[in-house]
Amino acid sequence: MPSIIFGCLRKIPEGISLASDFYRVESNQVQFLRDMTFMQDSTRIVDQQIYPKVYDLIDSAEQFLVLDIFLFIETSIDTNPEWIPTTTLLTNKLVQKKKNNPDMPIYFITDEFNIFYYSHKNKHLEQMKEAGIEVIMTNMAKLRDSHQPYSLFWRLIPRWFGNPNYQGWLPNPFTEPKEDIAIRSYLKLLNFKANHRKIILSEKEAIITSANPHSASSLHSNIGFRMEGEILQDILFSEKAIAKLSGSSIDIEFSPQPTTGPIKIQYITEQKIQKSLLSNIEQLDASDSLDIGVFYISDRKIVKALKKARERQAGIRILLDANKDAFGKEKNGIPNRQVAWELHKAGIPIRWANTHGEQFHTKMDIFTEPDSVVIIGGSANFTKRNLGNKNLEANIAIKAPRRESISQEVKQYFHSLWQHEKYSLPFEAYKETSTLKYWLYRYQEFTGASTF
């Protein structure tokens, strides 16, 4: 029992679970980005802004680049000819940048899932290494355990067998073409925690997003934010912390110039995201509103806070993924349909993203007060794993007057998704009232025995 408690409550390394100061920026120094996929007259429409802006960021960088990316696997496009080879495109862009600028430091931080916990190599990561880009695999063992008590077993026995050194003999269900997996890798996977961040940083600007450069995710709907100013130093500090806990280092120093302006922005990670969300939800009253668009919602603190805010007559609307698709495989609707039923009974309007094989992968809140708007968005789903110092996550919080263009853009984005059937469907479309599934969700959320 003490080992389980220690694994769940272990000290967080310095630089993890960070909330920066709020920095003032001008209207043109923070920008909302979105990827939208929808059907129109039986034709799939894919309208994307995020990775085109990422490529622009890479092109304009002059001093350094730091990327922290969760999913970075190029599943064969033959699996679905509509998929975009984003992994290859980003790899080529970075390799060319290094070739043209051999003295520029480029760091690429990623999760061990992309080499399936050392069962096989990732050809795109190998290409970057050969080009002189430093690839850092995140050591998640130093963070709190997500799947208890399984992680106690893993720490006691399988962990000490080490990594499989790119050898395996079990089938891999996640990639095409198939590559064999070691049993030690499967055992490590079952800890269910990851470096889930999606950050692209240069000395000029940063992009924080919910979008992975991963072919099987390339049609998902996502959001992102481009930002400039002093916040870049906090992002770099946090990325240095991940490199350090992974046995590496990022040897970059720079000091962005202070900026002024009507908009305030803050960098928040891990459990500080939950703290920011709860603080804003708990301040809602009848004169305020909250619009949420999110891929997963299951965290009990968030759910309870939303129900209490509705009791205070706050206007709340929640747009969810129906949790029915994952890379061509059918899902069972947990946890969103169970939480949606609970929130629906509390009087909160719910709609479902109208997806067709892709996912509504957005993670964003829009708090509207009489004179201002607070926007929180990035990589973090609203789950215990994402908000409880178990995964690594990165979000931005933005406070802006209602008249500002970014306030208007995010509100119009959500309004369009909510109002039009090509984007969203009524609650009844995926209504789920199974008591058994509800308590299965509660068990999985409590123990971490799930992928959400």
Region spans (language model):
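Charged, low-complexity intrinsically disordered terminal segments
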Residues: 1-452
